[in-house]
């Protein structure tokens, strides 16, 4: 919270006073502002976030069946001031389980129902097949039968996006809990933020995920059509097995890639100090890389996974990302991760314009004239969310205005000085 307060105070001073007159590196559409004075770069934030919820995950994709089979070990430390007598697990993909879920009922009410004419195969799900508590002595306690669905927000008993299980032995403040979870998931065919189309898979909110516990107990809501997410920081070590020859992009840094000899390859990605993990895979991506360099800052490797028909727009994607890294870094503090992955989703995938730690989806229009800010704007906006949502991890379910409001103000200000001045700010 101290880090959040420091950044918010920084907005009220540095962001109003001025910004650098240098254009972002390797950004051909960027023009240098002439009327805003340069200010010194703010120092990086000291230390990292508490690693409260840590995930070690193995997952295998079956693209023909559009399914995932996963196994994870969660190591969670109680950061609150009271004991935890139960757990909460988010199972977001159950929002697509049937038309009775709260998420789909809300989408229907607003007239934007992607499953209005869906076939049975179009739906998705997330099913926990095993839940085990690993005790300190290595023994295990099976909690599978204790896991049950809850709907604290709207009492919709058909909604299965949130589950709970009571613990026989409470987790005292400062103590740790280890859980082993096995599950299967199916991608919805038509999707919002996650799912599959053809051989393109974007995999987000895909694993059973703990809620947030504090001095008031659990903060864990059902999945709503107009809400996003909230979770603890932690360390992620994830192994994703996909067909050999398919490219993978994910949160964090790739550590290894192993051919399994059976037509599949396992990609291992690791990242600490993040509060979520998303990934994508497809055999059709083309890859481009560009380094973002700024004096006094660690280098950031920008990686772009692009649809082949959009290859001519690669530099414009990098321009948007570089503008965010430069100006947000000057105003709010440096981007703290070594990588940033930009995903260009295919036509009709409906997965564009969404942010996750160190990775986000952009979006390319059919017409992208040089005089427009597309695709630069959506890249700038989603890269900006790496600061406001990613590093300043507000509760997006209850206070979504915070990251969206500050990020929208900030990206509009960047547009007015670094891209085509099509916005009045």
Residues covered by each model-derived region:
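Bacterial N-terminal signal peptides
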Residues: 2-12
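Ligand-binding face of N-terminal immunoglobulin V-set domains in extracellular IgSF glycoproteins
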Residues: 67-95, 99-100, 111-113
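Acidic/His/Gly-enriched intrinsically disordered linker/tail segments
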Residues: 352, 404, 408-425
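Hydrophobic helix-coil surface modules that form long, contiguous segments used
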Residues: 205, 209-218, 225-380, 409, ...
